[in-house]
A protein has these predicted regions:
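C-terminal region of N-terminal signal peptides and the immediate post-cleavage residues
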Residues: 20-43
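C-terminal amphipathic alpha-helix
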Residues: 35-60, 105-156, 179-239
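Amphipathic, non-membrane alpha-helical rod segments
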Residues: 64-108, 157-218
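Bacterial N-terminal signal peptides that target proteins for export
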Residues: 1-11
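Cytosol-facing boundaries of transmembrane alpha helices in integral membrane proteins
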Residues: 3, 17, 29-30, 47
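Intrinsic-disorder/low-complexity regions
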Residues: 1, 27-29, 62, 221
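Bacterial N-terminal signal peptides
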Residues: 12-20
Length: 239
């Protein structure tokens, strides 16, 4: 195994682990998607509701592509997320058809609220998708580090550098191992804690999203440090 290339590859992965989280931004308020009060006309209300549905379908389409193309996701998590996205892609157009068939402003308004309350695309579904991808990405990097650590130890043991340099490299490896262990602790259970959150649990389940985001951030920080340690070991040993 080319330890130098592996170490540098892992260092790069460590910096990008959880990149999916960058897309996790709530871009829509947790309110009705209509632009005005219940006093607007029925036709205008239906049009506004349709726009709200189409916007969410656009977001879900992007999420579906992200999930399909992600190299970080586990097979089981990918399957679960694809099923959830597909259900929303079926449910939202069906809801829109109901709204377009409503004959009173009151009924259309009531049904329109379901675009938000029944799906929570922007405050729950989209963020949790990105968090699951990010968490799985961190886990994958942790696993790669587990392969790298004994390789680096062997490299240190067999190196012809001075005892002082070898001791410095060993200290880096101890720090690297500690950071990877911390990352594993932070990320443990994160994906499973959010993947099955539902709109019905909002806003109570917002705390899980917040906690997951913080754990991912902490784990990514540890991995970035571990990646720096790996690169420094390689530099010290001239490998």
């Amino acid at each position: 195994m080319n330890t130098r290339l592996l170490a540098r590859g892992v260092a790069t992965l460590a910096l990008t682990a959880g990149l999916g989280l960058a897309g996790s931004v709530a871009v829509d308020a947790d309110t009705t998607p209509t632009p005005a009060s219940q006093t607007i006309g029925l036709t205008a209300l239906k049009a506004a509701c349709n726009v709200a549905v189409q916007r969410r379908l656009g977001t879900l389409a992007a999420d579906a592509t992200f999930v399909k193309d992600s190299a970080a996701l586990t097979g089981s998590d990918r399957t679960i997320l694809e099923g959830q996205i597909s259900a929303d892609q079926v449910g939202l157009p069906a809801l829109d058809r109901t709204i377009q068939g409503d004959t009173t402003g009151k009924q259309a308004w009531t049904d329109c609220q379901m675009i938000v309350t029944g799906y929570r695309v922007y405050v729950l579904e989209d963020p949790k998708i990105h968090e699951v991808i990010a968490a799985d990405g961190v886990t994958k990097v942790d696993e790669t580090f587990a392969t790298l650590i004994p390789e680096l130890q062997s490299l240190i043991n067999n190196s012809s550098v001075s005892a002082t340099v070898k001791a410095e490299a060993q200290a880096d490896l101890v720090d690297l191992t500690s950071k990877v262990d911390a990352s594993q602790t932070s990320i443990s259970g994160v994906a499973s804690s959010v993947i099955n959150l539902t709109p019905a649990g909002w806003p109570g389940n917002a705390v899980q999203l917040t906690s997951a985001a913080q754990n991912i951030k902490t784990a990514r920080t540890d991995l970035a440090g571990a990646g720096a340690d790996a690169n420094h070991i390689i530099q010290l040993l001239g490998a």
